[in-house]
Amino acid sequence: MKKLMALALAFLMLGTLLVGSVYAAGSKSSEPYKEEFYMEVFLSDNGDAKIIMKNSLLGPQSRIDEFVSRILNQTNMTNEQAIKKYEAQLLGNYIAQLKNSGLETTNQTLHLLGVYNGTHNVTLVFTAYAKSFAKYYSYSKYWEMILDPTRGLATSPVPDSGLPYGSEIRNIFVIHLPQDAKLLEYPKPYTMEFNHSKFYVRSEVKGNTVIVSSDIILEAYLGPEGYKALFSKYDTFYVRYTTPKPGKEQYKTSVVMQEIIAKVLDSTDTELTTRQIFVKPEQDVDYFKAYIKMLGVKNATNMILQNNVKYLSSQGVVIKNASAQIYGLNDKGPLILETRYLVQNFTKVVNGTYEYSFDPTLGALNGISYRAKEETNQTLKIQFLLPKGAKIVKLPEEINRDVNGNRFTLKTTVKDNNITVISNVYIRYGALLDDVQKLLGNVSKVQIEYTLPEGKGSALGTKEIAGIAGAIVLIGATLLILKRR
């Protein structure tokens, strides 16, 4: 939900920037913060849109006067120069917020009205041309744009003690659909109250125009419980429509392969090899390669090992030896991170049976908040090479599922005492969370179990490395991703 609301939170910023200016941190007021927000969207056939947003501060007047005074109180500047300076700073901040939310804009303007013309309110007017404001999903065969009557308050963090001032916020959204569009869904009327706080939504359709309004009244010191009561059950955040011609989709395709090879030695030590193979998106793969070169291969491998060894040690694994290699840095194609270890305590031992648990879905469900924002193809290959005399007790059952083109397969093969488990998860771009849950929801852990010949076992293995396939191999990649962020 937080990812889903990134754009809504960006729209909230136009008001938030003003709230922060009107109410300094820790300030209190007996008068509520009053605001009116107006947003008008003119959608084109390709999903691009002209957007107009107006945000008016209506009170308290004393705070507005202080806010205006701070803007105009600039050394060696006329009032006009001071306003232009503030507008430029605010415009830069707002463009950055929209970009971070995933919305690309051009031809942006921002004007601050009512500062010194004798009016009793201040209004910000922001205009821009937004690319792909509405997105087409072939998965659902309709266009979709976010419209959040809560203005992001449904997911914004709130102090346990609440805010030291009340708020009265009026929101109006006017959405002009493309010509020949057929409206499918839009925010419906809603009413919720909690003590003296209220949240109302009203909506209507006039021709090809959708009009949604909301009123939000928040009492001072309203805590998280109150916000939850007001907003948690509201779930219609979209305008959806079809057009005679389907739209074009633009999205990334992620292809990652992960391998774990565990060779159980006669001494009950385990030779562990892990590989993570990045195939797509090619732009990200190239970035990873460039980052490693900048960091230095030796430094990069050391950092990967340090993180992996730290994780394994925290799980009770005894590491006797460790090394890392990086392949594909100077070639077109995949980037491969490989680590090798000699370890003890790799599996959990229960009544003489060795158990290895892992998540065959690679946590694919965790990366989806509402819709899949990219096409994903993940493959996991696990091999257990058991010594002579070992007996296989339990293996993962075969899985072959298809939900609306999303696929999840798991296959186990045994040759001599070598176990190979291969799982694959393919998620379509735009796949709905409900469908992915149907595909993966009841599979989060499977097990390989085996016994070793008498005298070959170890009393050391008492810790379970739960889901190591989704943890140890990912650490090296996570390191790079975090650095990028």
What are these regions (language model features)?
Residues M1-A8:
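Bacterial N-terminal signal peptides that target proteins for export
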Residues L9-L17:
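Hydrophobic core
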Residues T16-S21, L480-I481:
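Hydrophobic membrane-targeting alpha-helices
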Residues Y23-G470, L482:
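Lumenal/extracellular ectodomains and adaptor appendage modules
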Residues I475-R485:
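C-terminal membrane-anchoring or membrane-association module
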